Amino acid sequence: MTRSLKKNPFVANHLLGRIEKLNRREEKEIIVTWSRASTIIPTMIGHTIAIHNGKEHLPIYITDRMVGHKLGEFAPTLTFVRHARNDKKSRR
């Protein structure tokens, strides 16, 4: 179910503050965050945000096509490990 249009998009306060501060100073630096639930807003375009995937922070460059999506959508938490090619038993 999508968020109601009456409400504003969720963005963590610490993340919003850091982005506004960098926009005022016109600087670009990597912003480290654990907030995967934050929505990408237009003021984030052009910044690089390192999003936590449970193990490490993945740097993601924010573009205009990402606006409206959540940060967590761009940092996958699971990695699929393939079965060995010669292991017939586990591939059944």
UniProtKB/Swiss-Prot annotation:
Entries under HAMAP family matching the protein: Ribosomal_uS19
Gene assigned in the entry: rps19
Protein localization: Plastid, Chloroplast
Record protein name field: Small ribosomal subunit protein uS19c
GO molecular function: rRNA binding; structural constituent of ribosome
GO terms under biological process: ribosomal small subunit assembly; translation
Positions in coiled-coil regions: none
GO cellular component: chloroplast; mitochondrial small ribosomal subunit
Function: Protein S19 forms a complex with S13 that binds strongly to the 16S ribosomal RNA.
Major place of residence: plastid
Keyword vocabulary terms for this entry: Chloroplast, Plastid, Ribonucleoprotein, Ribosomal protein, RNA-binding, rRNA-binding
Keyword rRNA-binding: yes
Keyword DNA repair listed: no
Entry superkingdom: Eukaryota
Family of the protein in this entry: Belongs to the universal ribosomal protein uS19 family.
Annotated source species: Phalaenopsis aphrodite subsp. formosana
